[in-house]
């Protein structure tokens, strides 16, 4: 999983907002459903994982049931549970969110599922160091004709923080 902060920035949704939490839940619900569905389809062909019988999933109990989280009604969870009870799932473990630093840099998005750590920072890799800058902030500031050398220098002087740069409107803070 990578680029959650990018997706939220592209939708102009603040990372720590209630709306961001809803989007995050929908994304992970979709990933969980798709992984269960595909694992069940593979189990139809190759059989369930060796210790499936007796597992919570074999009884129609999925992760959200164990955490008392109510899924949305976007998917037919009851049907999927029945299919899983009938056919099993091929994988005992389905999703493993982990850091994705190198590939995220290659693909040009924020690593993992975390917020953007700073608007400007130095990234150190085996081949050297390079500056990483929040392109979404630059785009926003350019849209209001505020991206210039003065703002760039203040951003650097403030270690990537815009909180104390008076010229930048609060909506971007």
Positions of predicted regions on the chain:
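Long, C-terminal-biased catalytic regions of enzyme "large/alpha" subunits
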Residues: 1-173
């Amino acid at each position: 999983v990578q680029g959650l902060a990018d997706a939220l920035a592209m939708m102009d949704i603040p990372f720590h907002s209630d709306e961001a939490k809803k989007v995050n839940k929908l994304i992970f619900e979709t990933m969980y459903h798709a992984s269960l569905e595909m694992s069940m389809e593979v189990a139809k062909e190759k059989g369930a994982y060796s210790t499936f019988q007796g597992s919570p999933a074999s009884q129609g109990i999925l992760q959200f049931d164990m955490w008392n989280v109510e899924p949305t009604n976007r998917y037919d969870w009851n049907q999927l549970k029945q299919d899983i009870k009938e056919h099993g799932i091929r994988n005992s473990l389905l999703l493993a969110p982990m850091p994705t630093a190198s590939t995220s840099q290659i693909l040009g998005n924020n690593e993992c599922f975390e917020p953007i750590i700073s608007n400007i920072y130095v990234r150190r890799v085996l081949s050297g160091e390079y500056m990483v800058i929040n392109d979404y902030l630059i785009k926003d500031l350019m849209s209001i004709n505020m991206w210039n050398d003065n703002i760039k220098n203040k951003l650097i002087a403030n270690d990537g923080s815009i909180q104390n740069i008076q010229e930048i409107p609060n909506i971007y803070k």
